[in-house]
């Protein structure tokens, strides 16, 4: 079960060192190194090759819904889905399923169906996604979720602030979270495919309380979000730092504890100084960093949407230029180099 630790006091702000900022940080700073990838064993490589072969089949069809399945709902892979089916995607699912081949293939297939049904299978609204920036914009008017900076291992940071909740509980809140997860993935540098969550449960008096609504989500919503994160974003969470946790939030965490898989629990850090995990020049000054960040929705939101779209455009153009095939590496797709660092086996690849 979760253990509660006494919160350490963070150093006060030094106004002389603060950096005023109101938009996302576009690129990973040169001072942060990306950890090296652990090489695959011979057996792991064989399993990877089998997964690649399966999803490279030109006759492959996938359901358009995670739960409601019929033969009429089987559709071939679209170009954007092939761009999602990367080398690192296969490895994430293989690790999450403990290298059980059938489980891995089934999980990826299920996620493809879920992404179609949820409305995010086209890698951005410019390609046809139903979850758009305009749809969820109202959810972020209070700045309850913010993508800002990178932590020590080059993971982009997504701040979650339940205390800035500004809307009633609805499916749109889940859509908003998924939208932000997709956007923080856009910000990942070449060589890093996981993210960091910084979750602050502090209450913010400047955000009016929504009548009849708790700032701690209902258990049903919590379970749905956990299902999405653990099933459809496996191995994406690198670290989750939680702070200012009130008793109500502890109660919520205890209630959802049985639904959190052991690997996810290991990545949760409670009430430790954020500066232990994030460089000060990448961290909000509220948590001991040097970034004097103030959320202005009219400034931040358009900048986030535009920057993320630029990154997706870069990714997709490189996907097409490298052959538009399943199994390309995110290192190559997010990078700027001209030649493939991770070429796909020609006998397995297909357009």
Swiss-Prot record:
Domain of life: Eukaryota
Gene3D superfamilies: CRAL-TRIO lipid binding domain
Entry keyword annotation includes RNA-binding: no
Species the sequence originates in: Saccharomyces cerevisiae (strain ATCC 204508 / S288c)
Subcellular location(s) per record: Lipid droplet; Microsome membrane; Endoplasmic reticulum membrane
Record function comment: Has phosphatidylinositol transfer activity. Involved in the regulation of the phospholipid composition of plasma- and endomembranes. Altering plasma membrane composition may provide a possible mechanism for multidrug resistance. Involved in the regulation of sterol biosynthesis. Contributes to efficient phospholipase D1 activation in the regulation of phospholipid turnover. Regulates the release of fatty acids from lipid droplets.
GO cellular component: cell periphery; cytoplasm; cytosol; endoplasmic reticulum membrane; lipid droplet; nucleus-vacuole junction; phosphatidylinositol transporter complex; plasma membrane
Catalytically driven reaction(s): a 1,2-diacyl-sn-glycero-3-phospho-(1D-myo-inositol)(in) = a 1,2-diacyl-sn-glycero-3-phospho-(1D-myo-inositol)(out)
Protein name in the entry: Phosphatidylinositol transfer protein PDR16
UniProt KW keywords: Endoplasmic reticulum, Lipid droplet, Lipid transport, Membrane, Microsome, Transport
Membrane topology term: Peripheral membrane protein
Span of domain CRAL-TRIO: 135-295
Additional detail: Present with 15361 molecules/cell in log phase SD medium.
Major location (coarse): other
Listed Pfam families: CRAL_TRIO (PF00650), CRAL_TRIO_N (PF03765)
One of the GO biological process terms: response to xenobiotic stimulus
GO molecular function: identical protein binding; phosphatidylinositol transfer activity; sterol binding
Quaternary structure and interacting proteins, as annotated: Homodimer. Apo-SFH3 forms a dimer through the hydrophobic interaction of gating helices. Binding of phosphatidylinositol leads to dissociation of the dimer into monomers in a reversible manner.
Protein encoded by which gene: PDR16
């Amino acid at each position: 079960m979760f253990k509660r630790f006494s919160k350490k006091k963070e150093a006060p702000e030094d106004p002389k060192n603060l950096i005023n900022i109101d938009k996302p940080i576009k690129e990973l700073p040169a001072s942060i190194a990306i950890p090296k990838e652990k090489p695959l064993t011979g057996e792991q490589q064989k399993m990877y090759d089998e997964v690649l072969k399966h999803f490279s089949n030109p006759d492959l069809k996938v359901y358009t819904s995670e739960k409601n399945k019929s033969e009429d709902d089987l559709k071939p892979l679209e170009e954007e889905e092939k761009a999602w089916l990367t080398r690192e995607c296969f490895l994430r699912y293989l690790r999450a399923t403990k290298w059980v081949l059938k489980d891995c293939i089934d999980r990826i297939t299920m996620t493809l169906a879920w992404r179609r049904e949820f409305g995010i299978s086209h890698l951005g609204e410019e390609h046809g996604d139903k979850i758009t920036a305009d749809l969820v914009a109202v959810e972020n008017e209070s700045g309850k979720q913010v993508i800002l900076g990178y932590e020590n291992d080059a993971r982009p940071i997504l701040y979650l602030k339940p205390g800035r909740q500004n809307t009633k509980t609805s499916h749109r809140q889940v859509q908003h979270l998924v939208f932000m997860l997709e956007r923080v993935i856009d910000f990942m540098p070449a060589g890093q495919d996981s993210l960091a969550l910084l979750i602050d449960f502090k209450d913010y008096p400047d955000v009016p309380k929504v009548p009849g609504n708790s700032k701690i989500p209902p258990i049903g919503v919590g379970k749905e979000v956990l299902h999405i994160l653990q099933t459809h974003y496996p191995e994406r969470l690198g670290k989750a730092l939680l702070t200012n946790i009130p008793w109500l939030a502890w109660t919520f965490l205890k209630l959802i504890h049985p639904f959190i898989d052991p690997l996810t629990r290991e990545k949760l850090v409670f009430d430790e100084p954020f500066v232990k995990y994030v460089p000060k020049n990448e961290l909000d000054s509220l948590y001991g960093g040097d970034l004097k960040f103030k959320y202005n929705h009219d400034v931040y939101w358009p900048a986030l949407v535009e920057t993320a779209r630029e990154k997706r455009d870069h990714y997709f153009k490189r996907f097409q230029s490298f052959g538009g095939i399943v199994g390309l590496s995110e290192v190559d797709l997010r990078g700027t180099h001209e030649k493939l660092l991770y070429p796909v086996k020609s006998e397995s690849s297909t357009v």
